[in-house]
Amino acid sequence: MEQQITETGTKEELSPNFALKPGKMRVMKRNGKVVAFDREKIKVAIMKAFLAVEGSSAAASTRIHDQVEQLTDDVVSVFERRMPSGGSLHIEDIQDQVELQLMRNEHQQVARSYVLYREERKNQRNEE
Protein backbone atom coordinates (compact mmCIF):
# COMPACT_ATOMS: atom_id res chain seq x y z
CA MET A 1 0.00 0.00 0.00
CA GLU A 2 1.29 3.46 -0.88
CA GLN A 3 1.82 6.27 1.62
CA GLN A 4 1.53 9.98 1.09
CA ILE A 5 2.63 12.75 3.42
CA THR A 6 -0.26 15.14 4.05
CA GLU A 7 -0.10 18.93 4.48
CA THR A 8 0.25 18.46 8.24
CA GLY A 9 3.32 16.27 7.71
CA THR A 10 1.68 13.00 8.70
CA LYS A 11 1.80 9.89 6.55
CA GLU A 12 -1.47 8.70 5.07
CA GLU A 13 -2.07 5.31 3.53
CA LEU A 14 -3.54 5.50 0.05
CA SER A 15 -5.50 2.43 -0.83
CA PRO A 16 -6.01 1.28 -4.41
CA ASN A 17 -9.63 2.44 -4.19
CA PHE A 18 -8.64 5.87 -2.84
CA ALA A 19 -10.24 7.47 -5.89
CA LEU A 20 -13.61 6.16 -4.73
CA LYS A 21 -13.38 7.39 -1.13
CA PRO A 22 -16.11 10.02 -0.52
CA GLY A 23 -15.61 13.31 1.29
CA LYS A 24 -11.99 13.90 0.27
CA MET A 25 -10.53 16.06 -2.44
CA ARG A 26 -8.17 14.20 -4.71
CA VAL A 27 -5.89 15.22 -7.53
CA MET A 28 -5.46 13.35 -10.78
CA LYS A 29 -1.88 13.76 -11.89
CA ARG A 30 -0.83 13.84 -15.53
CA ASN A 31 0.20 10.18 -15.36
CA GLY A 32 -3.32 9.23 -14.24
CA LYS A 33 -2.34 8.53 -10.64
CA VAL A 34 -4.80 9.82 -8.02
CA VAL A 35 -3.33 11.37 -4.88
CA ALA A 36 -4.64 13.26 -1.87
CA PHE A 37 -5.17 16.99 -2.34
CA ASP A 38 -2.30 18.85 -0.68
CA ARG A 39 -2.72 22.56 -0.03
CA GLU A 40 1.00 22.90 0.70
CA LYS A 41 1.92 22.04 -2.89
CA ILE A 42 -0.15 25.00 -4.09
CA LYS A 43 1.51 27.25 -1.53
CA VAL A 44 5.00 26.14 -2.59
CA ALA A 45 4.23 26.72 -6.28
CA ILE A 46 2.93 30.23 -5.60
CA MET A 47 5.95 31.04 -3.42
CA LYS A 48 8.33 29.86 -6.15
CA ALA A 49 6.61 32.16 -8.64
CA PHE A 50 6.96 35.11 -6.25
CA LEU A 51 10.63 34.29 -5.65
CA ALA A 52 11.25 34.17 -9.41
CA VAL A 53 9.94 37.73 -9.69
CA GLU A 54 10.97 39.29 -6.37
CA GLY A 55 14.30 37.50 -5.88
CA SER A 56 15.45 35.18 -3.14
CA SER A 57 15.31 37.92 -0.50
CA ALA A 58 11.51 37.75 -0.77
CA ALA A 59 11.62 34.43 1.08
CA ALA A 60 12.13 36.38 4.31
CA SER A 61 9.39 38.92 3.57
CA THR A 62 6.33 38.80 5.82
CA ARG A 63 4.39 40.65 3.11
CA ILE A 64 5.16 37.95 0.54
CA HIS A 65 4.34 35.15 2.97
CA ASP A 66 1.01 36.79 3.81
CA GLN A 67 0.16 37.23 0.13
CA VAL A 68 1.10 33.63 -0.66
CA GLU A 69 -1.02 32.39 2.24
CA GLN A 70 -4.01 34.46 1.11
CA LEU A 71 -3.68 33.35 -2.51
CA THR A 72 -3.44 29.72 -1.40
CA ASP A 73 -6.58 30.16 0.71
CA ASP A 74 -8.36 31.71 -2.29
CA VAL A 75 -7.44 28.81 -4.58
CA VAL A 76 -8.42 26.16 -2.04
CA SER A 77 -11.72 27.87 -1.20
CA VAL A 78 -12.76 27.82 -4.87
CA PHE A 79 -12.49 24.04 -4.91
CA GLU A 80 -14.10 23.64 -1.50
CA ARG A 81 -17.11 25.64 -2.73
CA ARG A 82 -17.29 23.68 -5.99
CA MET A 83 -16.98 20.31 -4.28
CA PRO A 84 -18.15 20.54 -0.66
CA SER A 85 -18.45 16.75 -0.49
CA GLY A 86 -15.02 16.16 -1.99
CA GLY A 87 -14.15 14.93 -5.45
CA SER A 88 -11.39 14.70 -8.02
CA LEU A 89 -9.55 17.58 -9.63
CA HIS A 90 -7.13 17.43 -12.50
CA ILE A 91 -3.77 19.06 -11.84
CA GLU A 92 -4.37 21.42 -14.77
CA ASP A 93 -7.54 22.75 -13.09
CA ILE A 94 -5.57 23.61 -9.98
CA GLN A 95 -2.84 25.33 -11.97
CA ASP A 96 -5.43 27.28 -13.97
CA GLN A 97 -7.02 28.47 -10.73
CA VAL A 98 -3.63 29.57 -9.36
CA GLU A 99 -3.10 31.66 -12.51
CA LEU A 100 -6.56 33.16 -12.21
CA GLN A 101 -6.10 34.10 -8.56
CA LEU A 102 -2.73 35.69 -9.27
CA MET A 103 -4.29 37.82 -12.02
CA ARG A 104 -7.38 38.74 -9.96
CA ASN A 105 -5.14 39.91 -7.15
CA GLU A 106 -3.09 42.06 -9.54
CA HIS A 107 0.08 40.00 -9.43
CA GLN A 108 0.54 40.06 -13.21
CA GLN A 109 4.32 39.63 -13.16
CA VAL A 110 4.07 36.68 -10.80
CA ALA A 111 1.31 35.18 -12.95
CA ARG A 112 3.51 35.57 -16.02
CA SER A 113 6.37 33.82 -14.22
CA TYR A 114 4.00 31.02 -13.22
CA VAL A 115 2.68 30.65 -16.78
CA LEU A 116 6.18 30.60 -18.26
CA TYR A 117 7.28 27.93 -15.78
CA ARG A 118 4.22 25.81 -16.66
CA GLU A 119 5.04 26.13 -20.34
CA GLU A 120 8.68 25.24 -19.73
CA ARG A 121 7.67 22.12 -17.76
CA LYS A 122 5.20 21.16 -20.49
CA ASN A 123 7.97 21.36 -23.08
CA GLN A 124 10.27 19.27 -20.88
CA ARG A 125 7.59 16.59 -20.49
CA ASN A 126 7.03 16.53 -24.24
CA GLU A 127 10.75 15.96 -24.83
CA GLU A 128 10.90 13.03 -22.39
For each predicted feature, which ranges?
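Extended catalytic cores of very large enzyme megasubunits
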Residues: 1-128
